[in-house]
Amino acid sequence: DYDNGYSLYIGIPFCPSTCAYCSFTSYPLGVWKNRVDDYLDALEKEIDYTAQKFYHKKLNSIYIGGGTPTTLSPAQLDRLIRKIKCSFDLKDCLEFTVEAGRPDSITREKLLALKKNGISRISVNPQTMKQQTLDIIGRHHTVDDTIQSFKLARELSFDNINMDLIMGLPEETLDDVRHTMELVKELAPDNVTIHSLAVKRAARLTIFKDRYSDMQMVNTQEHMD
């Protein structure tokens, strides 16, 4: 509804670790774990304010991103989603997405908390299916973690799963991209989002550029095709 509708984005600024390409506001959970509930306290106040300001409009979609929303515990996820459901009228909401994101943050208990609260879409984001690249960019999970997290979500009856991939990551060749796409195709996600690597000034790839200076980062039309 372009005239009377709006979409709601809620950011959870915590991650298991900081990816080398990331320039978003994100804090390592290991350091900030004891402040997550404080963040949710503040977030609930913003939710109340937003609900009051937009009460006369139709809420069409909700996206909980980050960061990594599934760094929250099952109880914290339940708290946040219940707050959203209590504060907003969701009768016109067509899609409610939670970016499960990093496979190393996904558990059965967290997925069950999402399922119980009626989340209609999740995202399981490997970025690549090449283990060497995952290690280089600081993602502390394996390719198999991605596969098992995806299969777990399917087992729990999630029928709208997105997967994010990034083209142009360090040391990735065209054959690596083909390999990633073959593995993703086997999983058969409901949609795939392809990002082209853009190195921003706040990313570790820029801040510690000497560490990555000898690494190839190539993204061509052939890769995208």
Set out the residue ranges of the language-model regions:
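Canonical Radical SAM [4Fe-4S] cluster-binding loop centered on the CxxxCxxC motif
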Residues: 5-38
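Conserved non-cysteine loop/helix-boundary elements of the Radical SAM core domain that shape
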Residues: 26-225
